[in-house]
Every structure is written in C-alpha cells, then in structure tokens.
Design a protein with these regions (language model features):
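Extracellular and organelle-lumenal recognition/adhesion modules and their flexible linkers in secreted
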Residues: 4, 11-17, 22-349
C-alpha cells in the first residue's frame, strides 16, 4: 500500500512481508522572500494613482522614494498600463518628468527597508555571514547598465550592484548574488536591518564600485544609467525577491490577505465611528484593537471626516502597537456621534 502526500510517494509498505522503504520529500518552505510587496500588488495609500513623491514618501506599500531634487519623476502602480511579466498582475512604474543632469551630490532611487527581525539568520556583520540572491523583473525605455545598492540601516556599509537592460520596453529577469557582509552593524530588532534600492540617477558622491562592500553610503554603482536624465523615460519593476543562498528560486507568491497583513505592520488605514447618548461637557472614549499588530506605536493622521453632531472636540490616538483610542467631548445633551472618520496609522522604518 502506498501513502501519497501532495502527489509524491511517501511511505510504501509491501503487501507480503519484506522491508519498509521511505522516500524523502523535500519540505515546502514559505516566506523565503525578505521583500514585502515584491509583486507590487498592495497600494493602500494611493489606490493606483500617480504620485510625484517627496523624499521619504511611499508611492506604494513598503517602497519608498528617495530624492534630492523635487518633481524629477513620478511613481505609479501599473504606470503606462503595460502587460506585466507572466505570473504577475502588478508592477511599480517610474516615469521621468524632465531632462535632468544629475549633480555630484544628487540621488534618486526607489528602496525598501527590511525590518531587522526578518534577517537574523543571515548573520551579517559576523564571520558566518550568509550569501543572498536578489532577483527581479525589470523593463525600461532605456537600455544599458543600471545600478542599485544594498546597505545597512545607518548607511555605513553598502554594496553597489549593476545589471544590464538589453532591450528597450521588454521585461527582463535579473539575478544578482551577493556575498554576505562580515563587517558593520546589521540590526536584528524591530528597526531597519537592511535596505535594498534601485537607482534612478545618482551622483558621484553616492556611487561606488560595483560588486564590493564599502564603508560608505553608496546608493548605486559608478556609471549607471540615469532614468531622470531623459524626459519621459520609464522604469518598471516587479517580482523583487531577496532570499538566502546563491540561487534565485521561483518567486515566493503569498496570498493577498497575507501580503496585506505584512504591509499593515508598517501602515494601515482605519475608519471609526463613535455614537452615544451624551451629556453636555462629558467625555466619551472607545478602545479598539487593530487588525494587525504594528512594528511600533504608530503616528496617526486624519484622512477624512464625515458627519458629526454634538461634538465639541474629538481625539484619536494610538495607545499601543495593537490598539487605538477614539473619543470626543460632548457639546450638548442628546444623540452625539462622529461618523466614519478615517485615519492613517504609520510605523514605517
């Protein structure tokens, strides 16, 4: 009799005596990808709308824009509405808004900061540092050598890398293997442990030799193509994966609900309503658990407010990594309420 697990023969027992043989089945591993939203399908803030970012802004979830000059590029989920590579439905699209000559101290890139809790097994900063492999799909209206970098939280260690785009307006898969850094400080707590960035135009101050670890804040490799140098140039990317080992494996597809929850650890939007029979001058509060525990106690920003009645002053504040408090002081006696106030909670790295 054969026992079959997931379509593979596992343990076979003979019908009439004899020995028992066991066949080893390679275990299925999950969460090999340290990048969150690598397939660019979550965009809580902008819902697919185009953004001309300021430095530090997140055009789509977990992906941050860094820039030293404003209004040089826009970012949009699925910009240009091209067909993504097979297996993907979304991508991050950058469009240059000018013909800009990058200055020595300029930098433009799209990056993701990886929480330290997600990289302790890499053992970077020690003699046991593990090799990693970065893989992704990229498409650009430009061809040539492009660059990026991996660095630690305080940017005292960095590894510039290059890759070549051979054909314009064609999706190409790139793979870069990087020996783990045996030096520097690589945090393994709830702060940023590692940064991965893709250059869009970087001056010489922040450009270094590709393929080498350096004790400096390099954002890209020397001589890399500048996307912001050509008006209307496009740069699209998806399927970004960073994994332990020297081999690029297939993309780590995770359920939408799982990927959304991973993003909500750093940013989420909540809508709250509070309604009660009030007495003039009294305070009314409500505590609510968040759907996902956040990385740290978040900051709150009011996005929108609908109707309210008999409210003198209202308040909303996070009280922990997994709960918030909302409330108001009543301005009269009767049916008092705040209706559908929307708040953004951010605990980004």
């Amino acid at each position: 009799m054969a026992i079959t697990l997931n379509g593979s023969a596992g343990i076979t027992t003979p019908t009439y005596g004899g020995s028992v043989s066991a066949e080893y089945i390679t275990p299925v591993t999950g969460f090999k990808n340290r990048i969150i939203n690598g397939d660019m399908k979550i965009d809580q803030r902008n819902g697919g709308a185009s953004v001309t970012p300021t430095s530090g802004q997140y055009p789509i979830d977990r992906w941050q824009a860094a820039l030293t000059q404003s209004s040089k590029y826009s970012v949009q989920q699925n910009a240009g509405s091209v067909t993504p590579p097979a297996g993907f439905t979304n991508y991050l699209g950058v469009t240059s808004l000018s013909t800009y000559t990058v200055l020595t101290g300029d930098l433009f890139d799209i990056r993701q900061k990886i929480e330290g809790f997600n990289i302790p097994d890499l053992a970077w900063g020690t003699a046991d540092a593990q090799t990693i492999t970065l893989s992704f799909w990229v498409r650009s209206s430009l061809t040539g050598t492009f660059g990026g970098a991996i660095k630690n939280a305080d940017a005292t260690r960095s590894y510039p890398f290059t890759y070549t785009i051979s054909s314009a307006n064609t999706w190409e898969r790139k793979t870069i293997t990087i020996a783990g850094d045996t030096s520097g400080t690589w945090l393994t707590d709830n702060n940023a442990g590692m940064q991965v960035g893709f250059g869009l135009g970087v001056g010489s101050t922040y450009s270094g030799t590709a393929g080498e670890w350096a004790g400096f804040n390099f954002v890209s490799a020397t001589g890399a193509t500048s996307v912001v140098g050509t008006n209307g140039a496009t740069f699209y990317i998806t399927g970004v994966q960073l994994e332990k080992g020297s081999t690029a494996t297939s993309f780590d597809y995770r359920p939408y609900s799982t990927e959304l929850a991973l993003c909500q650890r750093y940013y989420q939007e909540v809508t709250w309503t509070l309604r009660t029979y009030s007495v003039n001058g009294y305070l009314y509060y409500n505590y609510c658990a968040l759907p996902v525990t956040m990385r740290a106690i978040p900051t709150a920003t009011t996005l929108s407010t609908a109707a309210e009645a008999l409210v003198f002053v209202s308040a909303f504040a996070p009280v922990s990594v997994n709960s918030v408090r909302s409330g108001f002081a009543a301005s009269g006696t009767g049916d008092a309420y705040i209706w559908e106030r929307k708040e953004a909670l951010s605990a980004e790295l």
